[in-house]
């Protein structure tokens, strides 16, 4: 096989240059420094890194246990533990090397005013884009209500759109009746991109104590178990987003290059990696190599040629 065929993994995402379609997902890499302690790890192996969810005021997070392993993934109920936006902007962001990759903020809140204020603070920071977490299932207020109500989702997006010129990425919840309607409303409200899916709500039980494993009772299920659901949702949302030129980050259970390729073919422009980092902190170079090999094998010059290339049965 001729391996001299030039290929590119670069992606133009909302006007931002991603050197690869891989995106490290919020909550899995701390504030961009967590995995830099691992020998061989580099943020440069990802097109973007989405920082840990940030709220207006500091949050202590949920009581333990916060994580539970499942047969094909994991449950987490961290509860958005973070030091608050003031500390993130003033103390944490200055420590990041913004030449490594595109660092994006992740904004959470219990009220629309919370979302607006945190977005406003990040607008005056060096982050490349802002992701709105309106779909977090780990807390008892805020995220679930916003993410599962298309009208409320649109109100959050519109309010944040009014206070930032940076690209807005809206993270969609799979725990709703019609994700396409939410996608449509968020696009109309001013979202530049959509990321999906967030975790699905689930629980685990300790049969000896007959108590929930998680201190919060319920948590977000991630990992390979949700990949088939995520792929379907990405395909459905892509049908809504494509006519408007809206970019998509597809995510949910990516562990192999084949997984990443499926999301691209389903309609994603970029592919999120989260739980896969726990299996293998050095997963990104392997995914990049696998995607590049696929492009070589199929004589494609750019990874962008894969986006939305799904061939449906007639």
Regions found by a protein language model. Name each.
Residues 1-103, 109:
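N-terminal capping/small domains of soluble enzymes
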Residues 1-5, 221-246, 255-314:
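Alpha/beta catalytic cores of nucleotide-metabolism and tRNA/nucleoside-modifying enzymes
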Residues 26, 107, 134, 172, ...:
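Short glycine-centered, acidic/aromatic-flanked micro-motifs in structured strand/loop junctions
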Residues 27-28, 252-254:
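Active-site metal-binding loops of divalent metal-dependent hydrolases
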Residues 43, 110-249, 255-262, 266-268:
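Alpha/beta enzyme core
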Residues 52-54, 134, 198-199, 275-276:
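Short secondary-structure boundary segments
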Residues 58-62, 204-206, 281-284:
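Short, charged, surface-exposed secondary-structure boundary motifs
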């Amino acid at each position: 096989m001729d391996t001299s065929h030039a290929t590119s993994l670069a992606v133009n995402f909302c006007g931002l240059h991603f050197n690869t379609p891989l995106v490290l997902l919020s909550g899995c890499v701390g504030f961009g420094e967590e995995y830099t302690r691992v020998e061989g790890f580099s943020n440069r192996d990802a097109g973007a890194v989405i920082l840990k969810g940030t709220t207006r005021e500091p949050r202590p997070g949920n009581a333990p246990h916060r994580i539970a392993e499942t047969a094909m993934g994991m449950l987490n109920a961290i509860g958005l533990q973070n030091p608050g936006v003031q500390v993130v902007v003033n103390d944490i962001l200055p420590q990041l090397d913004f030449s490594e990759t595109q660092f994006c903020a992740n904004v959470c809140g219990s009220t629309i005013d919370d979302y607006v204020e945190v977005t406003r603070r990040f607008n005056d920071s060096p982050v490349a884009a802002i992701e709105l977490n309106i779909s977090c299932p780990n807390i008892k207020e805020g995220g679930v209500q916003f993410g599962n109500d298309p009208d409320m989702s649109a109100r959050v997006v519109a309010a944040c759109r009014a206070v930032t010129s940076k690209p807005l990425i809206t993270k969609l919840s799979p725990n709703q009746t019609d994700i396409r309607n939410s996608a449509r409303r968020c696009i109309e409200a001013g979202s530049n991109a959509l990321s999906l899916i967030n975790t699905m709500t689930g629980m685990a039980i300790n049969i000896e104590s007959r108590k929930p494993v998680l201190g919060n009772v319920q948590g977000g299920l991630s990992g390979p178990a949700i990949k088939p659901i995520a792929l379907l949702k990405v395909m459905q949302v892509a049908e809504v987003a494509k006519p408007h030129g809206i970019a998509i980050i597809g995510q949910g259970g990516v562990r192999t290059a084949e997984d990443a390729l499926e999301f691209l073919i389903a309609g994603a422009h970029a592919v999120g990696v989260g739980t896969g980092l726990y299996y293998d902190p050095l997963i990104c170079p392997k995914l990049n190599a696998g995607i590049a090999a696929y492009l070589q094998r199929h004589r494609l010059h750019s990874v962008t040629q894969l986006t939305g290339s799904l061939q449906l049965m007639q």
